[in-house]
Amino acid sequence: MNELLHLAPNVWPRNTTRDEVGVVCIAGIPLTQLAQEYGTPLFVIDEDDFRSRCRETAAAFGSGANVHYAAKAFLCSEVARWISEEGLCLDVCTGGELAVALHASFPPERITLHGNNKSVSELTAAVKAGVGHIVVDSMTEIERLDAIAGEAGIVQDVLVRLTVGVEAHTHEFISTAHEDQKFGLSVASGAAMAAVRRVFATDHLRLVGLHSHIGSQIFDVDGFELAAHRVIGLLRDVVGEFGPEKTAQIATVDLGGGLGISYLPSDDPPPIAELAAKLGTIVSDESTAVGLPTPKLVVEPGRAIAGPGTITLYEVGTVKDVDVSATAHRRYVSVDGGMSDNIRTALYGAQYDVRLVSRVSDAPPVPARLVGKHCESGDIIVRDTWVPDDIRPGDLVAVAATGAYCYSLSSRYNMVGRPAVVAVHAGNARLVLRRETVDDLLSLEVR
């Protein structure tokens, strides 16, 4: 079998097929048709894939109320509506994400506001909107939020974000629970307990849970187990100091997100149901060990829901061979996007699966690098891959699993506008975010 024709089901959207002439289709729509209608680069979301992962995650964790979709992975009004319709909650971490959610009429009581440096205006907007929870990240924020809630005449439910000293086995930039970093309050140093005491001393904040997030793209539960042990340990200390009656409302342990996905056919993350069962057992066992009732377990998947069901479609431009030794060369395939729509390879060393999707080729594979159009040597989308030897300008290629942290991390580098985003479902396509134009690029100029 020609491996370059294979579309690994653990990597590509669930509704990916090839038509009778070999063109790759998603939800029954040829990618060539989408490129012709909407242009390239183009993000294509398999709506059924996205929604099915929402439902599977909710079922695995007992209820959509226990699953808070991490908006930072990818958010637009359409996605917010899908999340709402599937019964999940929503985590936002800026006033902008909150504004998008509210624009989509997402129920504010199902929104949680995160962030290590929330401004007064962001906290005020969240309180005014009636968000369900705010995760406080510093003593300064506790004071600010207490004053804002007091001015609004409400008592705001909050969680305290903890730093639990866990080194997740992931990239440094997406590991978030070790001590030397910007998020949370350290359990080991006593800062977390000091924050809990301060919340209890306020008039307008109610502590309802403890939060931890150890990182992203995690495939095993070891880090979660240690994090849960330390979160529950702090909860035990809080109950011991303030008594069971006063602490009865602290009924939630939020272990954050970080559930990994397959970017390559060789990746093998655990099924969500298996992971949920293990996490539930961990929290239950840790609670029993210290004599506490088992709290509600909340998780915050973003990548695990948004990542697998989206591809990025590019048109091939320049193709050139570069000698890498006296006897070998690498095929450099330049496309019409790049690091402005996918910075993850440059930022994290991310790896991807890429395929020729506009036709079938029987040409032998050659080693290749998929690169963008930007004036930057690090503008690499797929560092090491294989392409058919006859790949040529005008071909369409697709990169799989780009639904998380691609559009959301996109930029206007080199004044290249952001791509359009199209959702596909049952043979129909609809535009959910239009392509940025030159007029958009000039819209902020004052003269």
Curated annotation (Swiss-Prot):
N6-(pyridoxal phosphate)lysine PTM sites in chain numbering: 72
Active-site residues annotated for this sequence: 375 (proton donor)
Keyword Cell cycle in annotation: no
Cofactor: pyridoxal 5'-phosphate
Cross-referenced Gene3D superfamilies: Alanine racemase, Lyase, Ornithine Decarboxylase, Chain A, domain 1
Binding residue positions for pyridoxal 5'-phosphate: 258, 300-303, 405
Enzyme Commission number(s) of this protein: 4.1.1.20
GO MF: diaminopimelate decarboxylase activity; pyridoxal phosphate binding
Any GO BP annotation: lysine biosynthetic process via diaminopimelate
Note from the entry: Was identified as a high-confidence drug target.
Family: Belongs to the Orn/Lys/Arg decarboxylase class-II family. LysA subfamily.
HAMAP family (UniProt xref): LysA (MF_02120)
Name of the protein in question: Diaminopimelate decarboxylase
